[in-house]
Amino acid sequence: MNLNFMPLLHAYNHASIDFHFNSSTRDFCVHEVPLYEFSNTGEHAVIQVRKSGLSTLEMLHIFSQILGVKIAELGYAGLKDKNALTTQFISLPKKYAPLLEKNTHNLQERNLKILSLNYHHNKIKLGHLKGNRFFMRFKKMTPLNAQKTKQVLEQITQFGMPNYFGSQRFGKFNDNHKEGLKILQNKTKFAHQKLNAFLISSYQSYLFNALLSKRLEISKIISDFSVKENLEFFKQKNLSVNSNTLKALKNQAHPFKILEGDVMCHYPYGKFFDALELGKESERFLKKEAVPTGLLDGKKALYAKNLSLEIEKEFQHNLLNSHAKTLGSRRFFWVFAENVTSQYIKEKAQFELGFYLPKGSYASALLKEIKHEEGENNDEF
């Protein structure tokens, strides 16, 4: 497979919308929503931290330096953007809590502010969040483009959006996935196992994005062309589909088509299950009750079946499903932005947007769907 970045397809068909977005502490804010309420008792202090111009890992090093706590003792649910104003929850052993107030000034000098202190019986672990609330400010926005943006947001609110991994996943030079493949091929290796695992996961992410874009292409072809033309397309791709199946797929109201053999998942969290009655599952998809999933290949990955598997096979890799430490999983192909709010400030030519996304989903994917710029990984995160 070609490992160079190819343009990823958009869900909707509007022309590109011109505006400026700068990922900065003024124009981009991220607020973590915790997975559970904290009990206010237990051996772990839980602090809500606001950081500015720092990555999560840089923040952890600062806490370690100032408080004397080992980085391994600090718990966090996920990585937050460096070029943003962000809040997230950090856990640390209770004995360090008295040092927080004493070091308020030292922390503020390093662009960190403690917003709240609580306690809980367990350490926060990766993935212990529901999702994130986002705020974005777009600049140099004309009234016409503001109207177009609102129309796109209406579509996204109704039908959702592709759950692409954001460009942050692939590094400054868009080559993390290439390094991940080299690790699998035993062509390179780094001293830190976490770095090796992250780079391999970047390769998984690259394959997922490519699979999702391919599925979008197939969905658009099903919607836009006749059954006869579709039969010819699938025949050329050596995919076995009959005319009755194609008619049923064209009748699905959602722009992203659920195929025979898809692995579904209850939304926003729940168990995986096979799509058996496609019409029924498409209706549940429209109601935001269940969503089709895509492959993150690995040793214990759950694979699709039938037509969905025929397409998925192109994006599997034997080195991933034989790698002992790469277990694999599945990821929502599609997500739904919630609590979407927007306002256009005409005199400033600015458009302000707020929304919520579930964990693992990227604001840059929503920006990409709105802006429709040509090329890949040109978002400004």
Positions of the model-derived regions?
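Non-catalytic, substrate/partner-engaging modules appended to enzymatic cores
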Residues: 1-381
